[in-house]
């Protein structure tokens, strides 16, 4: 059985999905068009939806940081956070991440903690899988798990809906060691001010 913690936040106070719909110019995130090709590790972050999200990250960042404060509370001063959250779109007929993986296999520190934030319903085969188990979640829930050391990924989305989510990582400040490794998603060095930040 997968090990994770389920947290909740008030979507009226932290309206992430509304903001993402606005910056993407899409009314229905679950209705995003089905993919005509399966994503790979090289292409899973390069859709037009991703470009719109990352082009507007300055608009999303204040609400993202509010969410981090709500989730971490007093612990916020003991960790660094991922400066730019990772955006995921699991279109129908596709796989949102190119392969099953543990984040440590791609240069991430083994003491990082992952926070997965669905912005739509996540169920069936459109959801995140952790240790071979689908993790069902709703908008307003956050799944916290050990992504550095747990196998996680996606399967082909054969549901009727696309899943949109974002995720971010935290790192205990005591574990931070500057290095030249870079993130797979957008090539940022795992350094404070680049991949990592304070809240």
Swiss-Prot record:
Highest taxon, organism lineage: Bacteria
Keyword 4Fe-4S on entry: no
Keywords: Antibiotic biosynthesis, Streptomycin biosynthesis
Keyword Lipoprotein in annotation: no
Biological processes per GO annotation: streptomycin biosynthetic process
UniProt pathway: Antibiotic biosynthesis; streptomycin biosynthesis
Role, per record: May be involved in the formation of N-methyl-L-glucosamine.
Name used for this protein in its record: Streptomycin biosynthesis protein StrG
Source organism of this protein record: Streptomyces griseus
Lineage of the species this protein comes from: Bacteria, Bacillati, Actinomycetota, Actinomycetes, Kitasatosporales
